[in-house]
């Protein structure tokens, strides 16, 4: 049974984990334009090539349903495991709180919740339980963080808004010294909430003209917008670990 353009576009978009707004931003159209195609109000589009490139699908398939969804090269790249060759394998060593740090390791605080993280790298002492995670100095150096671990905080992500990339409970590491917004990167942010406390979350950010930010959740169809001046950047997420 032949599918419609609306069905094919939605299939490809959801497979990439993109919202209608995020996809629209990628190709220079509005969220409403993407929605119009997906609900069947537009049976064709002049943006087939741009859509195909960003969704990693064949333009013939997207436009007319002809042939496979993806090229053989893309299919292979999606199927191939991201495991490096054995020559590049590292080693895993068991350690606990009594194990001495190696010369290439530092410890950083592991908080119980993002709510206790401060934008200047401080932590609220009444919550901090003393738990720490270890990072190699090489890892911190690679991402541009301080190699002594200062300014780096870890905590578990909460909620399902960033699934499937960052499921509930995922441990994330944030460099609070890195607040420069790069489109598409993940950040810990704080905004004014309904009460006296600020709402702190992990989100994907995009800058827009007029001092606006698009605040994207992987598991939401509609993005938020806020003035950059109203959003406190706690720091950039540079690492996360998911329990499978």
Swiss-Prot record:
Q: List the molecular function annotations (GO) for this entry.
A: DNA binding
Which segments constitute the HTH cro/C1-type domain?
Answer: 9-62
Q: Which SUPFAM superfamilies match?
A: lambda repressor-like DNA-binding domains (SSF47413), LexA/Signal peptidase (SSF51306)
Report which superkingdom the organism of origin falls in: Bacteria
DNA-binding span(s): 20-39
Q: Name one Pfam family in it.
A: HTH_3
Functional description taken from the UniProt entry: Regulates pectin lyase production in response to DNA damage.
Q: What is this protein called?
A: HTH-type transcriptional regulator RdgA
What species is this protein from? Pectobacterium carotovorum subsp. carotovorum (Erwinia carotovora subsp. carotovora)
């Amino acid at each position: 049974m032949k599918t419609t353009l609306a069905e094919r576009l939605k299939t490809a978009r959801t497979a990439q984990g993109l919202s209608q707004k995020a996809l629209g931003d990628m190709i220079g159209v509005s969220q409403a334009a993407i929605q119009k195609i997906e609900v069947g109000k537009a049976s064709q589009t002049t943006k087939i090539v741009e859509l195909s490139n960003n969704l990693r699908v064949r333009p013939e398939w997207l436009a007319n349903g002809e042939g496979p969804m993806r090229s053989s090269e893309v299919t292979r790249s999606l199927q191939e495991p991201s495991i490096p060759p054995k020559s590049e394998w590292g080693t895993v060593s068991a350690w606990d709180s009594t194990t001495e740090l190696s010369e290439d390791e530092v410890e950083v605080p592991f908080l119980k919740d993002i709510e206790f993280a401060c934008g200047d790298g401080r932590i609220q002492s009444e919550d901090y339980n003393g738990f720490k995670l270890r990072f190699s100095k090489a890892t911190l150096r690679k991402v541009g963080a301080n190699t002594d671990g200062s300014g780096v905080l870890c905590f578990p992500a909460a909620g399902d808004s960033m699934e499937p990339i960052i499921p509930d409970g995922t441990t994330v590491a944030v460099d609070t010294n890195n607040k420069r917004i790069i489109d598409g990167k993940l950040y810990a942010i704080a905004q004014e909430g309904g009460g006296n406390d600020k709402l702190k979350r992990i989100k994907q950010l995009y800058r827009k003209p007029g001092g606006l930010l698009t605040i994207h959740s992987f598991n939401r169809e509609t993005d938020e917008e806020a003035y950059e001046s109203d959003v406190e950047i706690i720091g950039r997420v540079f690492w996360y670990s998911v329990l499978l």
